[in-house]
């Protein structure tokens, strides 16, 4: 008897790396049940759109993706952050099959089952232990918790994803171990608030291999560093205990890289943001961090044009950047977000002023980045290869996260492979990227 064709699903994943991990988990479950992935909407039986709802611009992108799926297919399931407040989706597209919020994996699967029942195939390949990944094979995002306990005035993430819920340390480490066994060379540790990991569990111990490991930021980072892959820490809130992890970086256990969204430098703006406001103390910490680990690369994000931001406060931000010498920077022009407390603040900044300040911030950062990268000319850097061609390759140093940071462009006298780790001599630098030659050949 001929086997019925497997039902096909097209998948759209929008938003941050945390949402990408949610997409990977849904796809892994669906593939385990026999569903196949289609490359195009019109070749699928159904479309799933994992939305982003953090900013109004992200909501518009999500609505556009839903509209495209409706036009090309007509059978659409919506999930993700925007689904937590479904009214806007329902108003625009009343005929979508289902709308669910973030992390509601079972609800998504139930919606798929209702619209497109699975066909059992006893000859299906078993799922790989690491699950289905949407990233290239050599790196993977490792999500260690959901939600956030902070209440920044501009942010609605706690409303969308709830309070902090950490995974047991052993569970995280088992997943990381499977990823490394499958060939992953770089683990990108992500969450809404990575350095708060384990607070909700009261740092409870769990058994991994032959020992107990505490659900604590430092302990988890140390154990991840023992697996033999690059470990990159992202979305770190600047709590005092972050200082402890710098020692691990100095020893080479985890990458000398910290992604800390400082958001601003003027204490008055930070107070309105409901963020830590003692940036003078932060400068002293950054100095100590670099004394302990001279190779430390700092990435951060900042918001310009926050309600009430004066010219003096913006000037404080520029001056602080010069002193802190942030290596990598992302900047956002403040957007009111439905449900955010900052919407009620007085003195909203005109759009043209936000643009001027954004331009000035990025111009200042370009000079800082160029200055810091120039210091690497003549040094040797370890590089992971992301793209390879017949005469060279594009990769990243330990100071560069995928998708958001710079690149290292390499020439080589031998073919290079994606995922390969090589040592490169840096020949020159520009504002954001390095250029070099693979050493030893």
From Swiss-Prot:
GO terms for biological process: tRNA modification. Residues 134-371 form the Radical SAM core domain. Signal peptide: none annotated. Binds 2 [4Fe-4S] clusters. One cluster is coordinated with 3 cysteines and an exchangeable S-adenosyl-L-methionine. The keyword Nuclease does not apply. Its cofactor is [4Fe-4S] cluster. InterPro entries: Elp3/MiaA/NifB-like_rSAM, Methylthiotransferase, Methylthiotransferase_CS, Methylthiotransferase_N, Methylthiotransferase_N_sf, NA-bd_OB-fold, Ribosomal_uS12_MeSTrfase_RimO, rSAM. One of its GO terms (cellular component) is cytosol. It holds the Pfam family UPF0004. Keywords: 4Fe-4S, Cytoplasm, Iron, Iron-sulfur, Metal-binding, S-adenosyl-L-methionine, Transferase. [4Fe-4S] cluster 1 binds at residues 16, 52, 81. It catalyses: L-aspartate(89)-[ribosomal protein uS12]-hydrogen + (sulfur carrier)-SH + AH2 + 2 S-adenosyl-L-methionine = 3-methylsulfanyl-L-aspartate(89)-[ribosomal protein uS12]-hydrogen + (sulfur carrier)-H + 5'-deoxyadenosine + L-methionine + A + S-adenosyl-L-homocysteine + 2 H(+). Transmembrane segments: none annotated. Residues 7-117 form the MTTase N-terminal domain. It is an enzyme of class 2 (transferase). Residues 374-440 form the TRAM domain. Its EC number is 2.8.4.4. One of its GO terms (molecular function) is 4 iron, 4 sulfur cluster binding. It is found in: Cytoplasm. [4Fe-4S] cluster 2 binds at residues 148, 152, 155. Catalyzes the methylthiolation of an aspartic acid residue of ribosomal protein uS12. Belongs to the methylthiotransferase family. RimO subfamily. NCBIfam families: 30S ribosomal protein S12 methylthiotransferase RimO, MiaB/RimO family radical SAM methylthiotransferase. This is Ribosomal protein uS12 methylthiotransferase RimO. It comes from Rhodopseudomonas palustris (strain BisA53). The lineage of its organism: Bacteria, Pseudomonadati, Pseudomonadota, Alphaproteobacteria, Hyphomicrobiales.
